[in-house]
Amino acid sequence: MAINTDTQYEKALGGSGNPLPADSHETEKLLTNASENKEENGMKKSFSVTMSSEKSMGDLEQNGHNLPYKSVSAGQLESAPLSPSRVSLARASSTATTAQEQGRPTDYLVLAIFSCFCPVWPVNIVALVFSIMSRNSLQQGDLDGARRLGRLARLLSVVSILLGLVIIVLCILSLTIFH
């Protein structure tokens, strides 16, 4: 099943130059036979050879021996899927895991409203504002900004509640013990 490409090759050279001996295309013949007959491990192989007579001598690359050659590619079209054990052992990037683990960021609006009943007015009002800003950022699609503002609203709400409890306890103690 030999392919006679010498005549096409001479046409590509334009009839000038040194014609190659007949055994110079052994590699191409072997690769063509191997790709036509074999299918290894359920994977299909591809092989492409472009031989056209429109190519001029300038388009052909030189291989260091004043003989032009053409590039040939052989590669896999399909690959076998990884086994489940290999997939589970693979380490994913931190951005991919954080996006999957954390869904919709929380705005802590209920906690901020609850903190408004504590007597630390500037802190709990700022927590309420940050919670509303977190909700607006989430509606605009800015997940990172919504997450950051939500965490800040949670921190300020907790601080407001704790300071409010401290103020309430001090007021009760001052009214009962010191009077």
Swiss-Prot record:
Main location class: membrane
Q: Which residues lie within the membrane without crossing it?
A: 110-130
Which InterPro entries does the entry mention? CD225/Dispanin, CD225/Dispanin_fam
Q: Provide the Gene Ontology terms for cellular component.
A: cytoplasmic vesicle membrane; endomembrane system; perinuclear region of cytoplasm; plasma membrane
| Segments of this protein annotated with the region Disordered | 1-47
- Signal sequence, renumbered to the chain: none
Q: How does it sit in the membrane?
A: Single-pass membrane protein
**Which intervals lie on the Extracellular side per UniProt?**
179
Q: Name one Pfam family in it.
A: CD225
Q: Which domain of life is it from?
A: Eukaryota
Q: Does the keyword Cytoplasm apply?
A: yes
Q: Where are the transmembrane segments?
A: 158-178
Q: Which GO terms describe its biological process?
A: cellular response to insulin stimulus; endosome to plasma membrane protein transport; glucose import in response to insulin stimulus; protein localization to plasma membrane
Q: Which UniProt keywords apply?
A: Cell membrane, Cytoplasm, Membrane, Transmembrane, Transmembrane helix
- Where is it located? Cell membrane; Endomembrane system; Cytoplasm, Perinuclear region
Residues assigned to the Cytoplasmic compartment are 1-109, 131-157
**Which family is this protein grouped under?**
Belongs to the CD225/Dispanin family.
Q: What does this protein do?
A: Regulates insulin-mediated adipose tissue glucose uptake and transport by modulation of SLC2A4 recycling.
Q: What is this protein called?
A: Trafficking regulator of GLUT4 1
